[in-house]
Amino acid sequence: GTLTFERADTERFPCLRLAYEAAERGGNLPAIMNAANEVAVQAFLEEKIRFTQIADIIEKAMSSFCFVQNAGLEDYFDTDRQVREELQKQL
């Protein structure tokens, strides 16, 4: 069997586009994305949101929470806590 690879369809898979953005920008953005994703997926599993809302919630979190370019360990912990607390209130 031969493996073939094609360019990822980021329109069809918007969370992949967000992951690329988080990886490219760095800082605490991957932590924002991860926390938002985990909260959104849990809300979906609890039938509080639709599956198609997950990417929207992540994207909104990535654009609204404080971005720290040179994040230290405490910044990551604080970011994770803040994102989870705020999104859990909203959802």
Predicted feature residues:
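Catalytic, metal-anchored helix/loop core of enzyme active sites in primary metabolism
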Residues: 1-91
